[in-house]
A protein has these predicted regions:
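Active-site-proximal beta-strand elements of phosphoester/diester hydrolases
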Residues: 1-18, 23-59, 136, 148-150, ...
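Hydrophobic pocket-lining residues within nucleotide cofactor-binding pockets
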Residues: 8, 85, 154
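Cys-nucleophile CN-hydrolase/nitrilase-fold catalytic domain and related Cys-dependent amidase chemistry
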Residues: 56-149, 211-249, 255-258
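Residue-level detector of flexible, active-site-proximal loop/helix-junction positions
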Residues: 10, 128, 153, 257, ...
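C-terminal beta-strand edge segments of enzyme domains
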Residues: 13-30, 224-280
Length: 280
């Protein structure tokens, strides 16, 4: 989750302006509705499918349909969910007491994954530990589950009261990095306290719940609206492509909660090419 909250040091006062530098670095294709979308793939990467849903029930309907349509001899696909998909219908502050619900939902996905054994389900979920709760991505394949990544950049006080920020990158030596929401902003920041992308990263798959106020009564710079919502995303993407010249593509799978009627910011951003040559 990425909160538009006043007082956070990521130049929120600039986000209402139309970004100009991004057009020089990347092209973007929007998928502004929930459902399944199939981005154009980088040739060397695992085929990726975005599964955008605003509720757990909607997500399960979509992923069950994907399983029913999935041919047994199909090459491996990676199905990406939004951030915290297993608790999409649960208030953020209630997540610490919902471990049984989360475990049950993950178990259902593990069972479902056996019907599509070569597929990888990347699911946003709380990860419960004695030392805290991580905002994590797990990867489920043929009935087994492992942690793929944990969120490293936590801006809002509401999230800080629920989740522990990870100080370790779980993925090492990977050309395609999975990221959780505000980590997109963190990776693009030019400050030492924010994490940096590994040098071999060529693509990012980001699971998001984007630009959403996280606590009642908070003093936000402004409530999310369509212009601010999209310009925040494009600014973050522009910083990534500017800072990391090796980065070729970013895929965002998003959801939005009931507090907004703005559709999700599912998108695929690719570094521009000139006469077939990728710009640097």
């Amino acid at each position: 989750m990425f909160a538009l909250q006043a007082g956070i040091s990521y130049d929120i006062f600039m986000y209402h302006k139309r970004p100009r530098e991004q057009a020089r670095h990347y092209d973007i294709q929007w998928h502004r509705q929930t459902g399944v979308f199939y981005p154009e793939q980088l040739s060397s990467e695992t085929p990726t499918v975005g599964v955008s849903a605003n509720t757990w029930r909607e997500y399960m309907d979509l992923i069950r349909q994907a399983a029913a349509d999935y041919p047994a001899d199909h090459p491996a696909d990676r199905f990406i969910s939004p951030e915290l998909m297993t608790t999409a219908d649960i208030d953020l502050l209630e997540i610490p007491g919902q471990r049984d619900v989360v475990d049950d939902r993950l178990a259902k996905l593990e069972e479902l994954s056996t019907s599509m054994p070569t597929a990888e389900l990347v699911v946003g979920t709380p990860e419960y530990h004695p030392d805290g709760i991580y905002n994590s991505l797990v990867i489920i394949k043929n009935g087994t589950r492992r942690v793929l990544e944990r969120k490293r950049t936590i801006f809002s006080s509401a999230e800080q009261g629920t989740f522990t920020a990870s100080n370790t990158l779980q993925q090492q030596c990977t050309r395609t990095l999975s990221a959780v929401c505000a980590d997109l902003v963190g990776y693009g920041m030019q400050y030492p306290q924010y994490p940096k992308l590994p040098q071999d990263t060529r693509a990012i798959h980001a699971s998001c719940c984007w630009a959403t106020p996280l606590e009642e009564g908070a003093h936000y710079a402004a409530a999310p609206d369509e212009e601010r919502y999209t310009s925040t995303m494009t600014r973050a993407l522009g910083r990534l492509f500017e800072r990391y010249r090796q980065l070729r593509q970013v895929i965002v799978v998003d959801r939005t909660p009931p507090s907004t009627t703005i559709p999700p910011l599912n998108c695929v951003a690719r570094r521009k090419t000139h006469n077939g040559i990728i710009e640097s």
